[in-house]
Amino acid sequence: PQYGERHGKGEALWKSLYVTRGDILIWIDTDITNIHPRFVYGLIGPLLHRPNLKYIKGYYLRPIRVGDTTHARGGGRVTELSARPLLNLFYPALSGFIQPLSGEYGGRRDVLEQLPFSCGYGVEIGLLIDILEDYGLDALGQVDLIKRMHRNQPLISLSKMSFSIIQTVIRKIDQRDGLQLLQDVNRTMKLIRTEERRFFLEVEKIAELQRPPMVEIPEYHTRQGDNYAA
């Protein structure tokens, strides 16, 4: 409670470092409709067999359902319209990741506990960038999980997700280049809503906050006890 109440995907992942005890952590999104054991063993395997790997991302085909029709391609809209262009522009070393925003990934605790976590949907791209900067491209891997199907979100939700991801990339550029771009930009988003034939604006604050590395939290040291390697 003393660290404040926040919500978001990254917040949940950051807190999972505190409540878990293993040397390897694997995260899998909960909205997968074709869940299969390969989503687990496919991610754990490379980390067990390749000691040089610090972090592994899943990739796959991403079908999209439109009405009653499922198209073999077309999923991963935020990746293709926001994340991939940003990575090619500012972090080209990461441009070869097939699914940089994949919700199926894992890493070694002694690496993850050293990293800040974006509280919202910027967490995936933020972790990729930080591990690249701290450990180099050879520490990162990706594994083929064949195909992933999930509940597709409406376009307005994807727009808000992109807003968070863009903020995270700006923050990482600020940290890398000693800039202060993020503190000067607008952190509210005007969303275009419709009701019958009427259009109106709805303003929503979407500030992608960041948690410090878990290793900086005193209670984490206490909880990990003998399992914690200082």
Label each residue range with its predicted role.
Residues 29-46:
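Acidic donor-binding/catalytic loop of UDP-sugar-dependent glycosyltransferases
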Residues 153-230:
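Terminal low-complexity segments of carbohydrate-biosynthetic enzymes
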